């Protein structure tokens, strides 16, 4: 560089960094680290994990300490340095025990922890998922907090995309693994999504969850986790998973005997002694698969299978036209549509007003009265009818929801006219 040559140096160990081949060469370089080890080993990039399951604490100490000696010898031979101070151990036990195994790596005692993050999942020594869900909720609430501050400055479509891109993936990372979480943890996840849905749609807390999800086109997270487990089972059934995953499952019943049964394609269920094991990924996924109709199981592709299993009744085409309009007017339109607006009928139904009568007369101020009958808005009503004259006859459902029988441009024409009417009426607080 600039007529200056760098000095040559030899590389005694390791692989060059920054190249496409670097990760592959590194994997080849460390691939034999697990040879001759007495316990199960998992390698992922530059992370290594040892697993040992026994009924004897002394046996566990002997096996793992022997493995650490082999790893130390391997690292010395191949000039790869490990940091024993960063090595952690997590001890799972379904019995109350007062002591942990005594483990040493390069003459350094290994620290036992209550929680450890492994490939994005926080594992806890009591085998529950409270800590993991606490962490992902903390991350997700930060983004939802930002969404709340931008509720009236960003469009509905932008807020919807932020949630789907930056929040829901956090809430669903490896969710089939921790779906056996407590009811309280599952409820906390749903509360976060409900709040995000209210921010996106602009609806108030008086809106039912059924209307809220119908408005935004989402499903509950628990239903999505259930569907993801069923899709996971489809991959297992069709040998679309690695062998180490397939080995976790019991045989199908047609492999256990020679005679034909109606449920031959079912997986044999695990005999579960504890609720903890019963709610874990594999034992809880098998009954979901076995309950499916044979025609669904025999779908020719994963996409076809998903279309049959994961059909979302809330994901209606109208949700796209619900994105239309300036943010404030779009919110007012959505609130009228879902019965949580400042119309007196909605306020009365939500216990925020003593009566539901309109200020113009003794008629009840419903959405239909507001758009079609109230004498206070006769002039702007003529403008509404004039703009939508090509789509007459009008009705309240057409004004609030549009129609799947109309193309997008015609629905936009209706929504534009309705939102201009809302703006000109000056009926709602800004």
Give residue spans per PLM region:
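Active-site palm subdomain of RNA-directed nucleic acid polymerases
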Residues: 6, 23-52
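Short, conserved micro-motifs composed of acidic
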Residues: 3-4, 66, 81-115
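Catalytic palm subdomain of template-directed nucleic-acid polymerases
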Residues: 48-73
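Short, conserved catalytic/metal-binding micro-motifs enriched in Asp/Glu and His
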Residues: 18, 44-49, 75, 118-126, ...
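Short, charged alpha-helical motifs in flexible N/C-terminal segments and linkers
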Residues: 72-83, 88-91, 111, 117, ...
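Family-specific functional microsites
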Residues: 311-430
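Short, conserved non-catalytic motifs in the polymerase core
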Residues: 1-25, 51-57, 107, 112, ...
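Basic, alpha-helical interaction scaffolds
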Residues: 107-177
């Amino acid at each position: 560089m600039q007529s200056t040559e760098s000095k040559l140096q030899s590389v005694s160990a390791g692989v060059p960094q920054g190249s496409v081949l670097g990760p592959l060469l590194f994997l080849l370089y460390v691939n034999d680290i697990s040879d001759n080890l007495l316990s199960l080993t998992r390698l992922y990039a530059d992370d290594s994990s040892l697993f040992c399951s026994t009924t004897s604490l002394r046996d566990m100490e002997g096996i793992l300490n022997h493995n650490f000696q082999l790893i130390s010898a391997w690292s010395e031979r191949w000039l790869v340095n490990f940091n024993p101070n960063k090595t952690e151990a997590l001890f799972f036990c379904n019995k109350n025990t007062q002591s942990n195994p005594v483990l040493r790596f390069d003459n350094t005692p290994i620290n036992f922890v209550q929680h450890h993050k492994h490939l994005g999942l926080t594992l806890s020594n009591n085998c529950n998922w409270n800590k993991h869900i606490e962490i992902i909720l903390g991350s997700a609430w930060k983004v939802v907090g930002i969404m709340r501050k931008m509720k009236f400055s960003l469009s509905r479509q932008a807020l919807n995309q932020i949630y789907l891109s930056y929040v829901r993936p956090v809430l669903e990372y490896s969710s089939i693994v921790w779906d056996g979480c407590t009811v309280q943890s599952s409820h906390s996840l749903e509360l976060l999504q409900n709040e995000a849905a209210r921010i996106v749609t602009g609806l108030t807390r008086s809106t039912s969850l059924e209307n809220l999800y119908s408005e935004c086109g989402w499903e509950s997270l628990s239903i999505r986790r259930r569907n993801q487990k069923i899709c996971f089972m489809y991959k297992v059934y069709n040998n679309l998973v690695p062998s180490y995953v397939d080995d976790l499952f019991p045989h199908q019943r047609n492999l256990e005997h020679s005679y034909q049964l109606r449920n031959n394609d079912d997986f044999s269920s695990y005999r579960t002694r504890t609720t903890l094991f019963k709610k874990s990924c594999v034992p809880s996924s098998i009954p979901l698969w076995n309950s499916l109709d044979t025609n669904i199981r025999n779908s020719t592709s994963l996409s076809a299978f998903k279309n049959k299993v994961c059909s979302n009744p809330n994901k209606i085409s109208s949700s796209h036209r619900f994105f239309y309009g300036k943010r404030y007017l779009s919110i007012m339109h959505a609130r009228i549509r879902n019965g949580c607006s400042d119309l007196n009928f909605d306020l009365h139904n939500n216990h925020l007003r003593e009566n539901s009568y309109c200020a113009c007369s003794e008629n009840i101020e419903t959405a239909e009265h507001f758009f079609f009958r109230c004498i206070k808005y006769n002039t702007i009503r003529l403008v509404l009818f004039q703009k939508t004259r090509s789509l007459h006859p009008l009705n309240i459902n057409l004004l609030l929801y549009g129609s799947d029988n109309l193309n997008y441009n015609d629905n936009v024409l209706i929504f534009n006219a309705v939102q201009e009417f809302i703006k000109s009426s000056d009926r709602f607080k800004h």
